[in-house]
A protein has these predicted regions:
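Thr-Gly-centered strand-to-loop micro-motif
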Residues: 13-14, 101-102, 123-126
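Conserved PLP-binding catalytic core of the aspartate aminotransferase-like
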Residues: 74, 78, 83-119, 135, ...
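Conserved core of the PLP fold type I
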Residues: 1-5
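PLP-dependent enzyme catalytic core of the Aspartate aminotransferase-like
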Residues: 107, 114-124, 128-164
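Short loop segments at secondary-structure junctions
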Residues: 7, 30-35, 103-106, 142-143
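Residue-level detector of flexible, active-site-proximal loop/helix-junction positions
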Residues: 16, 98, 130
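PLP-dependent aminotransferase class I/II
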Residues: 8-85, 89-92
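Short acidic/glycine-enriched loop/turn segments that link adjacent beta-strands
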Residues: 23, 95, 130-133
Length: 164
């Protein structure tokens, strides 16, 4: 609605998260015609690969898969948030395919990240975003979510006992 009512607003979206096409660097923009015209004139001639375009088109046609991924993410994001909150961790509210888990300090976040990596789980330490005490954890499949909860439960138990 805002894009339709203003001549200087652009809305962009990516196919990275819900469609799982992050590596293809495909997205779209909704904007007034004069802005789209300008973007067409300044963009590179082949700014989206043929494979990326084909994948994006296929993803748009398969809305049932998108709905399945959305529902899975909502369910397991809520589950993981509840599990980690019960461990005393602070989880920022999220509507994305990841949660931001805040630890007591940067050192505890680094040690939690190391514990998860030992279990084969890779998170993103977000110190470079000004959040040294936080980890960004993507909502994966059920097994991955349960593993994150398991390894962080073990880590926090050890931490509280002075062993982590």
């Amino acid at each position: 609605a805002l894009v339709s009512s203003r001549d200087n607003v652009v809305m962009t979206r990516t196919f990275s998260k819900i469609y799982g096409l992050g590596g293809l660097r495909v997205g779209w923009a909704y904007a007034p015609a004069h802005i789209i015209d300008t973007l067409h004139r300044i963009r590179g001639p082949f700014n989206v690969s043929g494979a990326g375009l084909a994948a994006a088109e296929a993803a748009m046609r398969d809305q049932s898969e998108m709905a399945r991924v959305r529902d899975h993410t909502i369910t397991w994001r809520a589950w993981l948030t509840a599990e980690l909150t019960a461990l005393g961790l602070q989880i920022d509210p999220s509507h994305a395919n990841f949660i931001l888990v805040r630890f007591a300090d940067a050192e505890q976040a680094q040690r939690a990240d190391a514990a998860l990596r030992k279990g084969g789980l890779i998170t993103r330490h977000v110190a470079s975003y000004g959040l040294p005490e936080a980890l960004r954890i993507t909502i994966g499949d059920e097994e991955a979510c349960r593993s994150v909860a398991k390894y962080l439960r073990e880590f926090m138990t050890g931490f509280l006992e002075g062993n982590a």
